[in-house]
From Swiss-Prot:
<dbReference type="GO" id="GO:0005829">
    <property type="term" value="C:cytosol"/>
</dbReference>
<dbReference type="GO" id="GO:0051666">
    <property type="term" value="P:actin cortical patch localization"/>
</dbReference>
<keyword id="KW-0175">Coiled coil</keyword>
<dbReference type="GO" id="GO:0043332">
    <property type="term" value="C:mating projection tip"/>
</dbReference>
<dbReference type="GO" id="GO:0008092">
    <property type="term" value="F:cytoskeletal protein binding"/>
</dbReference>
<dbReference type="GO" id="GO:0030100">
    <property type="term" value="P:regulation of endocytosis"/>
</dbReference>
<feature type="coiled-coil region">
    <location>
        <begin position="126"/>
        <end position="193"/>
    </location>
</feature>
<keyword id="KW-0963">Cytoplasm</keyword>
<dbReference type="InterPro" id="IPR027267">
    <property type="entry name" value="AH/BAR_dom_sf"/>
</dbReference>
<dbReference type="GO" id="GO:0005937">
    <property type="term" value="C:mating projection"/>
</dbReference>
<dbReference type="GO" id="GO:0042594">
    <property type="term" value="P:response to starvation"/>
</dbReference>
<dbReference type="GO" id="GO:0000747">
    <property type="term" value="P:conjugation with cellular fusion"/>
</dbReference>
<keyword id="KW-0206">Cytoskeleton</keyword>
<dbReference type="GO" id="GO:0060988">
    <property type="term" value="P:lipid tube assembly"/>
</dbReference>
<dbReference type="GO" id="GO:1990528">
    <property type="term" value="C:Rvs161p-Rvs167p complex"/>
</dbReference>
<feature type="domain" description="BAR">
    <location>
        <begin position="15"/>
        <end position="239"/>
    </location>
</feature>
<dbReference type="InterPro" id="IPR046982">
    <property type="entry name" value="BIN3/RVS161-like"/>
</dbReference>
Length: 265
């Protein structure tokens, strides 16, 4: 902050003492437009944060899929079973999620940034400039109200120096012009900014839907192919509501093994 700006800040800090309710400027139309803008600002900042989080989540999901697929592949790895004419369904699953990660998710990274993240970020950069304009308007309002208070006091209690009132009135006129120009500009342009949000974000919204559709469709298509390698009997048992019983039988067989009870003997 410059020295001049520092002095202005100190002066404004003392305005609250001299400004009475009768001096305060009230513009309900502006207040309404500022509230609408604040709603847009909060939504825009939240959208920027969540859009970045969405991209990170896609990466996290595929990374987790790959990790668990590697574990499952090792779990199913049985050379005797494979040598006997079987196959390692875990390997097919691992290859499936690896292909999904490299051929789908990584290809979506660029389009997601270009069509969703970048436009949202660019829109959000305007918030800082608008906040500065709103802050400046508030400062000019304080100056205007203080000038009104000064004139009111000189009218109520005339000074010995007769030139003080004309000077104060001139300062009031200047403060009024500065405030009203900025106030009217914000009242005109804030609604325009708010109304532009839908046509601006529409293409990004459409792109986000298409990216989600591609992610879900490709994932479903690839994973659906793994079903042909799953045990048909287990699939039939699940469809017929018998799978829980089968699992209980397998757990019973495991419990009957001596090695499962060695730790408690």
């Amino acid at each position: 902050m410059s020295w001049e700006g520092f002095k202005k800040a100190i002066n404004r800090a003392g305005h609250s003492v001299i400004i009475k309710n009768v001096d305060k400027t009230i513009d309900k139309e502006y207040d309404m437009e500022e509230r609408r803008y604040k709603v847009l600002q909060r939504a825009g900042e939240a959208l920027q944060k969540e859009a970045k989080g969405f991209l990170d989540s896609l990466r996290a999901v595929t990374a987790s899929q790959t990790t668990i697929a590697e574990v499952i592949s090792n779990l199913y790895d049985d050379s005797k079973y494979v040598a006997g004419g079987g196959y390692n369904v875990g390997n097919y699953y691992l290859q499936c999620v690896q292909d999904f990660d490299s051929e789908t998710v990584k290809q979506l990274d660029g389009p997601l940034r270009e069509t969703v993240l970048d436009p949202i970020t660019k829109f959000s950069t305007y918030f800082k400039e608008i906040e500065e304009a709103i802050k400046k308007r508030d400062h000019k309002k304080q100056d205007f109200d203080a000038a009104k208070a000064k004139v009111r006091r000189l009218v109520d209690k005339p000074a010995k120096d007769a030139s003080k009132l004309p000077r104060a009135e001139k300062e009031l006129s200047l403060a009024k012009d500065i405030f009203e120009n900025l106030n009217n500009q914000l009242k005109t342009e804030l609604p325009q900014l708010v109304s532009l949000r839908v046509p601006y974000f529409d293409p990004s919204f459409e792109a986000l839907i298409k990216i989600q559709l591609r992610f879900c469709t490709d994932g479903y298509t690839r994973l659906a192919q793994i079903q042909q390698y799953l045990d048909q009997q287990s699939r039939d048992d699940y469809a017929n509501g018998l799978l829980d019983t089968k699992i209980e039988e397998l757990l019973g067989q495991m419990t009957s093994l001596d090695i499962c009870a060695l730790g408690i003997k």
